[in-house]
């Protein structure tokens, strides 16, 4: 009896423990999603106490700017009206460092800051050096000629004579460093003297002269501390709640974030919106597919076909016009009238007429499309590759001899890629705190529930087995009594007189 009693108490103890585990599992199922959400919101908001604040303040991920040039192989033939032939040169790679300074938290749940940016050439990652010479269109001559097209003949003649005097030609042969970071040009001085509002610069002229050791202006964004629904959204840029470069209210809107973090808890229906001062507009990327980056689940967002579509293909983009072929965006209104166009590299996803007008272009999605891989729970980018091309519209301008017989064409100048992928300690910390721990909690709730269910079966099984033993005992006892009664009855029948006589008769026979 003692052993049976102990077994019964053990079974009851295991059952109680199972009930406790099951209750904990149910509580976790009800509470864990809310706890995870609170933990994520606590760590992605712009607040000095949040886990992501240091990452937001100074990007710890190695970020690179890779530049590819379209060298013009046949400049003399282009001047005589032939189709341009280009050859891609590069990449020329720069390590990009970004740090937010002048961080000021405001009373309306926003924070203002300036993000300083510096670029450092990486010879080991580049195919060439900054001293490489490259033949490109002379933007000052050909771009300036377009701007002078509607000017009086006298001004055109003055410009032609000035170009001859200064030895300026339609195409130039300069180093990578000069093209990107600037060079002294007497023509810049001439334009600033006689057409003072034509150029935004007073010193050196270069395509990226304002990108190094500089910033993109003052951003004011929502922190998400008081109102989670607006987290990371841009409130103002340089004090403006909208821009005035374009011809419609929609195109002038400042939408989305500053392009570094987005709101958490994304779904495949979510989109990535951000404002780019360099592109002078807001952009929207759409969900493409689910992926895994270094063990972390991500959503890949890519550019829709409508991003650079013209107004006839996509009416909401009409405000960015005057437009040319679909797939390129005229950015002259925010580049002081210079006939510059923004697009995907090699005119990928643009009207084929554009790539067919220039020999040497080979657009393909693998090499020339852009993407951002975002962790959907936190809205933090894990891997990104943003690619853009800058092109110049050139043609012969009557009255300016340097433009020769150039046929109208949108000629690519260069394309660049800004890329970065989270790794090292930041990736490890991110994975542990915001991926691994939520996963452990998620699975723990079901483990507890399952284990609790199994332990609850122990006393039930023991009870059933105990009842079975009792049944067998009583069944056995009843059967034994019946057998004894049968034997006794048989014995008594043998001892009766009638039975004895029968037995004697059988013996005599």
Swiss-Prot record:
Cellular localization per UniProt: Cell membrane; Membrane, Caveola
Residues the record marks as carrying a glycan: 102, 108, 116, 173, 212, 227, 255, 288, 310, 330, 383
UniProt entry tagged with the keyword Cell membrane: yes
Biological process terms in GO annotation: adhesion of symbiont to host; blood vessel endothelial cell migration; cholesterol catabolic process; cholesterol efflux; cholesterol homeostasis; cholesterol import; cholesterol transport; detection of lipopolysaccharide
Coiled coil: none
Alphabetical keyword list: Cell membrane, Disulfide bond, Glycoprotein, Lipoprotein, Membrane, Palmitate, Receptor, Transmembrane, Transmembrane helix
UniProt KW Transmembrane keyword: yes
Top-level taxon: Eukaryota
Tissue: Expressed primarily in liver, ovary and adrenal gland, and, at lower levels in other non-placental steroidogenic tissues, including adipose tissue, mammary gland and testis (at protein level). Isoform 2 is expressed at lower levels than isoform 1 in liver, testis and adrenal gland. At the mRNA, but not at the protein level, isoform 2 is the predominant isoform in testis (80%).
TM regions (residue ranges): 12-32, 441-461
Post-translational modification: N-glycosylated. The six cysteines of the extracellular domain are all involved in intramolecular disulfide bonds.
Gene Ontology cellular-component terms listed: caveola; cell surface; cytoplasm; lysosome; membrane; plasma membrane
Segments on the Extracellular side according to the record's topology features: 33-440
InterPro entries reported in the protein's UniProt record: CD36/SCARB1/SNMP1, CD36_fam
Membrane topology: Multi-pass membrane protein
Induction annotation: Both isoform 1 and isoform 2 are up-regulated in response to adrenocorticotropic hormone (ACTH).
Alphabetized PANTHER family for the sequence: SCAVENGER RECEPTOR CLASS B MEMBER 1, SCAVENGER RECEPTOR CLASS B TYPE-1 SR-B1
Function summary: Receptor for different ligands such as phospholipids, cholesterol ester, lipoproteins, phosphatidylserine and apoptotic cells. Both isoform 1 and isoform 2 act as receptors for HDL, mediating selective uptake of cholesteryl ether and HDL-dependent cholesterol efflux. Also facilitates the flux of free and esterified cholesterol between the cell surface and apoB-containing lipoproteins and modified lipoproteins, although less efficiently than HDL. May be involved in the phagocytosis of apoptotic cells, via its phosphatidylserine binding activity.
Family from the record: Belongs to the CD36 family.
Protein name, as recorded: Scavenger receptor class B member 1
Source organism of this protein record: Mus musculus (Mouse)
Name of the gene encoding the protein in the UniProt record: Scarb1
């Amino acid at each position: 009896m003692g052993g049976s009693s102990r077994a019964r108490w053990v079974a009851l103890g295991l059952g109680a423990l199972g009930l406790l585990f099951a209750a904990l599992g149910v509580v976790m199922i009800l509470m864990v999603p809310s706890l995870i959400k609170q933990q994520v919101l606590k760590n992605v908001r712009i607040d000095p106490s949040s886990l992501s604040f240091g990452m937001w303040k100074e990007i710890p991920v190695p970020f690179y700017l890779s530049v590819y040039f379209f060298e013009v192989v046949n400049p003399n033939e282009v001047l005589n009206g032939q189709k341009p032939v280009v050859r891609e040169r590069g990449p020329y790679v720069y390590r990009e460092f970004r740090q937010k300074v002048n961080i000021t938290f405001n009373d309306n749940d926003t924070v203002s800051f300036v993000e300083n940016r510096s670029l450092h050439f990486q010879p080991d990652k580049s195919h060439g050096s900054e001293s490489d010479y490259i033949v490109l269109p002379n933007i000052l001559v050909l771009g300036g000629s377009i701007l002078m097209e509607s000017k009086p003949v006298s001004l055109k003649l003055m410009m032609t004579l000035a170009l001859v005097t200064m030895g300026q030609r339609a195409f130039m042969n300069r180093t990578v460093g000069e093209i990107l970071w600037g060079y002294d040009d007497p023509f810049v001085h001439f334009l600033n003297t006689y057409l003072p509002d034509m150029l935004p610069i007073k010193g050196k002229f270069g395509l990226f002269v304002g990108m190094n050791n500089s910033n993109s202006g003052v951003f004011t964004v929502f922190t998400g501390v008081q109102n989670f629904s607006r987290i990371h959204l841009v409130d103002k840029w340089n004090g403006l709640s909208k821009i005035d470069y374009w011809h419609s209210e929609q195109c002038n809107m400042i939408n989305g974030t500053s392009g570094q973090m987005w709101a958490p808890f994304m779904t495949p229906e979510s989109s990535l919106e951000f404002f780019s001062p360099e592109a002078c507009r807001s952009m929207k990327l759409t969900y493409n597919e689910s992926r895994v980056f270094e063990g972390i689940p991500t959503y890949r967002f890519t550019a829709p076909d409508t991003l650079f579509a013209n107004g006839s293909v996509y009416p909401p983009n009409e405000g960015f016009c005057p437009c040319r072929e679909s797939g390129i965006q005229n950015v002259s209104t925010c580049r002081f009238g210079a006939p510059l166009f923004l697009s995907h590299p090699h005119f990928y996803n643009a009207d084929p007429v554009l790539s067919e007008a220039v020999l040497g272009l080979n657009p393909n999605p693998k090499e020339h499309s852009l993407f951002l891989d975002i962790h959907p729970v936190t809205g933090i980018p894990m891997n990104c590759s943003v690619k853009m091309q800058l092109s110049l519209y050139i043609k012969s301008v009557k009255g300016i001899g340097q433009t020769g017989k150039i046929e109208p064409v949108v000629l690519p100048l260069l394309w660049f890629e800004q890329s970065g992928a989270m790794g090292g300690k930041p990736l490890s910390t991110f994975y542990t705190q915001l991926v691994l721990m939520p996963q452990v909690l998620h699975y723990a709730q079901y483990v507890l529930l399952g284990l609790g269910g199994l332990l609850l079966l122990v006393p039930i099984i023991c009870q059933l087995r105990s009842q079975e033993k009792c049944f067998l005992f009583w069944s056995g006892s009843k059967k034994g009594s019946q057998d004894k009664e049968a034997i006794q009855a048989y014995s008594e029948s043998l001892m009766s007189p009638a039975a004895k006589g029968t037995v004697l008769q059988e013996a005599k026979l």
